[in-house]
Swiss-Prot record:
Its EC number is 3.1.15.-. HAMAP family: Oligoribonuclease. One of its GO terms (molecular function) is nucleic acid binding. This is Oligoribonuclease. Residues 7-168 form the Exonuclease domain.
């Protein structure tokens, strides 16, 4: 059921961080209510990229995406960037009205840049505002009492979103008296 109070969480895995030369290879999405309760999850989608794109990944991406199995899932995938965008957009539309939710996640500006370039319909559907958990992480480092959120950093899109939601819950408890 659609609600303007629902939040759109997206995570991308890419072949690198340069939006002009790198590509999206995985996308996942979760919808939560404003209290961060998960309403629905979209299965992560591995996006096909040709071998020449994968060959241009940096050392970190090659190691990480090979260890998680993502590189092989990308090679085996039949799903284009456009098809993945359409699937995720259809998922979001079930739960969130047009431009009512900020885009939520960790260091979400990086994901937003890739969405704007490669999945502009998702980018446009989200409100221009962003809820970036990284901001609270930094504030906690500066002003917190030393407690920190321990991340697993699996670099799997759906796991990363779940972890971002849990991290925001942690900071809400530790930093915010609202």
């Amino acid at each position: 059921m659609q609600s303007a109070d629902n939040l759109i969480w997206i995570d991308l895995e890419m072949t690198g961080l340069d939006v002009d030369s790198c590509k999206i290879i995985e996308i996942a999405a979760i919808i939560t209510d404003k209290d961060l309760n998960i309403i629905a999850e979209a299965e992560p989608i591995a996006i096909y990229q040709p071998d020449e794109v994968l060959a241009n990944m940096n050392e970190w991406c090659i190691k990480t995406h090979t260890e998680t199995g993502l590189t092989q899932r990308v090679k085996d995938s039949k799903i284009s960037t456009e098809a993945a965008e359409q699937q995720i957009l259809e998922f979001i539309r079930k739960f969130v009205p047009y431009q009512s939710s900020p885009l939520c996640g960790n260091s979400i500006w990086q994901d937003r840049r890739f969405l704007a370039k490669y999945m502009p319909n998702i980018d446009e559907y989200c409100h221009y505002r962003m809820l970036d958990v990284t901001t609270l992480k930094l504030l906690n480092q500066y002003w917190g009492d030393g407690k920190s959120f321990e991340k697993k950093n699996t670099h799997k899109a759906l796991d990363d979103i779940r972890e971002s939601i849990a991290e925001l819950k942690f900071y809400r408890q530790e930093l915010l008296s609202i």
